[in-house]
Amino acid sequence: MADDTAYILSEYLQTLDNVPNETKHIFDEISVKEVAVHDIWKRIQAADSQIQSYIKSHGSLTPHPKEDALYSTIREEYQKAINIQNEKVQLADRARLGLTRHIKRLDDRLAKAGHGFTAAELLNAPDYYASSPYGGYSPSGASSARQTPAPSRSGASTAGRRRTSATTRGAIQNGVYHSPYTASLADSGSTRGQKVSNATATTQLETKADSTTPNEMVSEEDMEEDNEKYCFCQQGSYGQMVACDNANCEREWFHMECVGLKAPPEGTWYCEACRDQKLVDAK
């Protein structure tokens, strides 16, 4: 069993060779779009300054000769900025989905190995994740608030579960766009892993904002929305989530704020319903 798991992990790591470059490409695009938003903001400020300067010189009762045109320009520029920001959210979701697909693939194979499958059977089986949108993320603004993984029921074993955190938006610092977005697969302090964001993507002004590569990480069909409901609140996946260690837990995944957790729990953790049930069973 240990040899099978090690073999699966070794093969799995080889599939991650292109992930850094693919993720960096997406965040380079986000960086270029951020520069475009900055340019739009400067144009908005320039138009507004014309109006404000005229008011200071002629008073607020005398309209600027081009006031209507300037206000129209400002509204159009704001709409452009909103559209670009939405595109940035879509790109971030695409990167997140790609990383989640890789994690789910490993979870699924390890879960199968734990049920008697051999490494050869797992690695020779058709790759379900290569052709199926098994990430549950939509690039639309509706899903941007979730910014989380879509927990998989297939990874019911404790070792296969992961606690995940929301996407952290990058910031422009000294002209470099810092966009944290890589995953850490192991957390030695608990039975579940935890994804940690810590990567950067540098601005490349010559890159086209709408550029794509033949080796696109995620296809459009991978962007289908996850309609699964989790937690006591029966909402979709968003923010930080933690898995109940009861393999038969009805809900399995919970939003940390809903269960009163400020930080990921150490060791075994059960939801309130499972804790109550264990007390009943113990009587």
Swiss-Prot record:
A zinc finger (PHD-type) spans 228-277. Zn(2+) 1 binds at residues 231, 233, 255, 258. CDD domains: ING_ING3_Yng2p, PHD_ING. Keywords: Chromatin regulator, Metal-binding, Nucleus, Transcription, Transcription regulation, Zinc, Zinc-finger. It is found in: Nucleus. Zn(2+) 2 binds at residues 244, 249, 271, 274. GO terms for biological process: DNA repair-dependent chromatin remodeling; regulation of DNA-templated transcription. GO terms for cellular component: NuA4 histone acetyltransferase complex; nucleus. GO terms for molecular function: methylated histone binding; zinc ion binding. Residues 137-224 are annotated as: Disordered. It holds the Pfam family ING. Belongs to the ING family. Component of a histone deacetylase complex responsible for the deacetylation of lysine residues on the N-terminal part of the core histones (H2A, H2B, H3 and H4). Histone deacetylation gives a tag for epigenetic repression and plays an important role in transcriptional regulation, cell cycle progression and developmental events. Has a role in silencing of mating type genes. The PHD-type zinc finger mediates the binding to H3K4me3. Interacts with H3K4me3 and to a lesser extent with H3K4me2. Component of a histone deacetylase complex. This is Chromatin modification-related protein png1.
